[in-house]
Amino acid sequence: MAVSRATKVSAASNMMSGIPGAPKRVSFANIREPLEVPDLLDLQVQSFEWLVGDETWFQRRVDAGDENPVGGLEEVLSEISPIEDFSGSMSLSFSDPRFDEVKASVEECKDKDMTYAAPLFVTAEFTNHTTGEIKSQTVFMGDFPVMTDKGTFIINGTERVVVSQLVRSPGVYFDQSVDKTTDKDVYSVKIIPSRGAWLEFDVDKRDTVGVRIDRKRRQPVTVLLKALGWTAEAIRERFGFSETLMATLEKDHTAGQDEALLDIYRKLRPGEPPTKESAQTLLENLFFKEKRYDLARVGRYKVNKKLGLDLPFESGVLTEEDIVTTIEYLVRLHAGEAEMPDRGQGGDATIPVEVDDIDHFGNRRLRTVGELIQNQVRVGLSRMERVVRERMTTQDVEAITPQTLINIRPVVAAIKEFFGTSQLSQFMDQTNPIAGLTHKRRLSALGPGGLSRERAGMEVRDVHPSHYGRMCPIETPEGPNIGLIGSLATFARVNPFGFIETPYRKVVDGRVTDQIDYLTADEEDRFVKAQANTPIDDEGNFLADRVLGRRKGGEVELLAPTEIDYMDVSPRQMVSAATAMIPFLEHDDANRALMGANMQRQAVPLLRSEAPLVGTGMELRAAVDAGDVVTAEKAGVIEELCADYITVMADDGTRRTYRLQKFSRSNHGTCTNQKPIVNEGDRVEAGQVIADGPCTQNGEMALGKNLRVAIMPWEGHNYEDAIILSQRLVQDDVLTSIHIEEHEVDARDTKLGAEEITRDIPNVSEDVLADLDERGIIRIGAEVQGGDILVGKVTPKGETELTPEERLLRAIFGEKAREVRDTSLKVPHGETGKVIGVRVFNREDDDELPPGVNELVRVYVAQKRKIQDGDKLAGRHGNKGVIGKILPAEDMPFTEDGTPVDIILNTHGVPRRMNIGQILETHLGWIASQGWSIDGDPEWAKRLPEELYDVDPGTNTASPVFDGAREEEITGLLASTKPNRDGERMVKANGKAQLFDGRSGEPYPYPVAVGYMYILKLSHLVDDKIHARSTGPYSMITQQPLGGKAQFGGQRFGEMECWAMQAYGAAYTLQELLTIKSDDVVGRVKVYEAIVKGENIPEPGIPESFKVLLKELQSLCLNVEVLSSDGAAIEMRDGDDEDLERAAANLGINLSRNESPSVDDVVQ
């Protein structure tokens, strides 16, 4: 390819541009990107800026040519204003929303379970129209949650994300379907508003045009036209060209406007007496009044565009012209015409007549954070409007002020309800930084006003050509939500109407320019686009005579360069941020790439992060934009630093101290820790990373570890995706992670008295309390395990009749002898760790606590989890597996120089899954770890820049998606790797090495692929899953053990397991499993007694579930009873209940033990 080497150098360094102080990473990219990746949080941040009418947003809109930009809150206040009383003599209007300073910092809000919010004030103006008096006041409208710099909200101390929603845009949609009986094409159209009644027209199989108003019964369309004041002559004049409409007019027997109105009223309000006035009002209110009907700006834009009208965007109601033009479009569509006159432009202009594709991104828009919150504020204000109206009529006119009319409760409640309970306000995924970043860029078709999982069909879930560059075709969940939840593409942005735009380079007369145009999906359909990897020279001219171009609907064909209108800006334009971090994505099957993109979000932060040897160049941008690293705001010099803070003296003389997060718990129990990566006296530039966060190294995303991998079977121990690991990874803490759990207990006021946090706990030995301080709270640094007391607490017991002795004690010692029970906070069953923090909140110290709570204690327990059998590991290509065996390092296969491999993966995991990217990554990983030097100027190295001819060992590389290292380059580089100290190359040019069995020292018969692969430790840890039970809680009705680890349940012995037992003839074992080990209540106790006393196990009794079955049959009036040989009914009793109770009491067993709310109670 004739690309000059100079161009290539700029392409390699371009990946890192924009962020100063970036670590070295040599790139194999060949394409120069004319545009940097935009800020990945813009989707959230800019939308919220629009809502609050921020200065930066205002300036951005003015620069874009918007003369009078209006913020979201201002827009909704002007919609509701003025609120008039029923007589119209008084009105109240709102304007000028503004915020005060936030009440507390983000850290304080997280600490104290507060909401990060700012007080909202508006100017309210009350006007008395009879006297002309105007009273104006500034009114407090409640605390309004504010977005943090990272694009999240802190609600009651937890970090949440509001997900953007993909919905059908308001507008007019034409549809075509086939009638089942006649096989004729049937056409229909819906006018869908943002709020209000739907209006639907259709042409049925009898070729008559009908209308449905607000989804009620169908009637001829001419009835609606007559109701709007059209005469039969006017209809003939406008629609004379359409036989269908003329036939409909003939069949319509309504005479004049009045009769048509009454006809419509009867259909909409059956059972109510129709009058002309009420019918007229009803129709006007449905479609022509702003209070009841709103197309919204976007709906008006879509209607104008589709029907060729030229009405102002502010007109949110339907007009007569809208309805008439829609009917004309429908009948022309039915008649098979391809175009119709453009009534907006006039003259000879025409618009195409075609049906709409509802899954096209020109017809689906995003409701971003700002709009979702704005809708809730609108709901709250409309509830408040009712209150204001009532107060206007009831209060004394003289005494009325805006403050007395307004009740802000509905507004505050609506906002609170949205953030607390809406399906779109989600608990932020904080497993690692990429999980949080992806969560903020997520697009969901679910939620209020969207689709539901059950109703969504294949079409809406499928990848659509219009997704290109807008929504990632790869990153979506597996399971019921597939295709309904997506991720915004890397370069995409959202326009003011909510449509997603993607950038293209303009092509003029076959020459590619650096002019960037952002196009929406329907604008893009008019042009022909070329791929980003189309070869061009330094001037931007296409090198080939024929260029592959993409037309409407995703069709591709070879075209002359002059036919091309636009060109992609980047090869990674079509994928999301997470997918763009998979090297050699182009060599992976889509299903596996999907798993790879999703599993990166599940990687737990390791003790020591390590950036990938083989990356894509996206690591730095993703880490910086995710916001878990600390960046310098201004250029300057590091004045002072320690583990907890960094002080920068800026060039302008200002001093700024950055506080670092130390070992705090994330939403998902992983450890968040920031550490400085600069030294005192270092010079830093604005935007430079000065401290690493979790899963980052030198400011780059670092989710896993580079491990030396051999791809081979090993004694069957890595069969079916199992993984064999070296003991070295356990000893050296290579894959060790820290997990922090939060345990909390509160002391409340109960009916019997106040609970107390204390060290004085009844019936507990002193050695159990050894680690508690004098308050009864565990000391920091204590090692704890399941069942240990973290916080001592006692609760008053219910009073019983006192014996004379107790009364005497009470008289002598006062309240002290009162009965209390132990309700201490204990470590849950199966958990261990070290106490790293304790927080105490007390009402006496003026801490805000919920009503009835006097004291709240939080204990943080950290666990260091080494890698072990059963943990799940994965690569970035969907190659996941569970550790099957951990071998001593000396037993692992080793190369000729004696170095053992770290991990063995099975060869069978590659061919049928078609994720070959992992093999190329392994080879390039080896090349990067050894370094390389290219001799001469071989053919395969023609596209490599100068800086890639000689690279040191251990240099990080970047192989960007769709523009990475090629197969012939990897083959050439394998032969060019630098030799080790003995002058030997362990891995040959074919990427394989001679390995030796670590146990015998014998060489393996065939060479094995060896290299470095980036391996992630996923959050599916065996410690969280392993579970065992001896006795525990039972279900109330069936008396069978509960299920699941959270309930401390048993293992289900189901239908198929019973069949297996029957097949083996193991009758007694089966009987035991179904009775005394499960729900034979009496038998359980007797068996326990027999085991304790060393006796033989007695006969099983009747299972409780059998009794339940009998009761259910009795409820169906079927009497089931057991008869003796002489036909007498036998009562099913389980022997002597008194003996049973006595035995249970002696053994200390509680027979009435039913479901308990949590495992903690079970363990207690």
Swiss-Prot record:
Q: Which InterPro entries does the record cross-reference, listed alphabetically? A: DNA-dir_RNA_pol_bsu_ext_1_sf, DNA-dir_RNA_pol_bsu_external_1, DNA-dir_RNA_pol_su2, DNA-dir_RNAP_su2_dom, DNA-dir_RNAP_su2_hyb_sf, RNA_pol_bsu_bac, RNA_pol_bsu_CS, RNA_pol_bsu_protrusion
At the top level, the lineage of the source is: Bacteria
Question: Looking at the UniProt record for this protein, which Gene Ontology cellular component terms does it annotate, in alphabetical order?
Answer: DNA-directed RNA polymerase complex
Which controlled-vocabulary keywords does the entry list? Answer: DNA-directed RNA polymerase, Nucleotidyltransferase, Transcription, Transferase
Q: Which GO terms describe its biological process?
A: DNA-templated transcription
Lipoprotein as UniProt keyword: no
Which class of enzymes does this protein belong to? transferase
UniProt-listed SUPFAM superfamilies: beta and beta-prime subunits of DNA dependent RNA-polymerase
One of the record's GO molecular function terms? ribonucleoside binding
PANTHER family, sorted: DNA-DIRECTED RNA POLYMERASE I SUBUNIT 2 (PTHR20856)
Tell me the protein family, please: Belongs to the RNA polymerase beta chain family.
The protein here is known as DNA-directed RNA polymerase subunit beta
